[in-house]
């Protein structure tokens, strides 16, 4: 089983940034998104995970900039952020990206989400942003600020609709460099036949090696963000470790 790494480029106000736990106002800027994405391409990435944070938080869009980034990359792009109706989905797919991630829309408009995962197949993945609470495994919606229901109920519904891929984030881990929630990922993999991509918390090459051991269980890859930008390891080191 191969294990794919997707270095992240999160874009806010035209700049590549990183957030802590997805919270608006915690951005650290890393400069030009195209330069960031090209750097990952040069380092050997086969995929880039590109996020429009302004669209995700409902405060505008960087779509033209992101379309330009996609056009100038040779690697495959997974595009995320603010895709919640036919117009935004079609605009995202028109950038030439390989696939898009639905977030909030899959929770707040389930009929629409069920239709598009069936219609677009591999070109649509669903992001499941999980907050583990005393009430159980809850999904976080709309830029992680509202409750989106029970993880297992939503997963069963999307599976029944034919969803082809899930991107799973433990919100408490994202941007914290505290290590991924391996138990959560293992449980999600056990409950769906669709491939799963991990997101959030990766702090070291060892974390990625641990995740890659779940490839046989259905964990297809991991998004890597802050650890790369913080210099904890290079993408080349990470790719070598999981090959």
Swiss-Prot record:
Tell me where it mainly resides.
cytoplasm
- Please name the InterPro entries in this protein's record: Aldolase_TIM, His_biosynth, HisA/PriA_Actinobacteria, Isoase_HisA-like, Isoase_HisA-like_bact, RibuloseP-bd_barrel
Gene Ontology process terms (BP): L-histidine biosynthetic process; L-tryptophan biosynthetic process
Q: Which residues form the active site?
A: 10 (proton acceptor), 129 (proton donor)
Places the protein is found: Cytoplasm
Gene Ontology MF term list: 1-(5-phosphoribosyl)-5-[(5-phosphoribosylamino)methylideneamino]imidazole-4-carboxamide isomerase activity; phosphoribosylanthranilate isomerase activity
Give the EC number(s) listed in the UniProt record.
5.3.1.16
UniProt keywords (A-Z) are: Amino-acid biosynthesis, Cytoplasm, Histidine biosynthesis, Isomerase
Pathway given for this chain reads: Amino-acid biosynthesis; L-histidine biosynthesis; L-histidine from 5-phospho-alpha-D-ribose 1-diphosphate: step 4/9
Catalytically driven reaction(s): 1-(5-phospho-beta-D-ribosyl)-5-[(5-phospho-beta-D-ribosylamino)methylideneamino]imidazole-4-carboxamide = 5-[(5-phospho-1-deoxy-D-ribulos-1-ylimino)methylamino]-1-(5-phospho-beta-D-ribosyl)imidazole-4-carboxamide
Pfam families, A to Z? His_biosynth
**Signal peptide segment:** none
**A single GO CC term, please?**
cytoplasm
* Record Gene3D superfamilies: Aldolase class I (3.20.20.70)
Name the protein family: Belongs to the HisA/HisF family.
Q: Tell me the protein's name.
A: 1-(5-phosphoribosyl)-5-[(5-phosphoribosylamino)methylideneamino] imidazole-4-carboxamide isomerase
- Origin species, per record, is Saccharopolyspora erythraea (strain ATCC 11635 / DSM 40517 / JCM 4748 / NBRC 13426 / NCIMB 8594 / NRRL 2338)
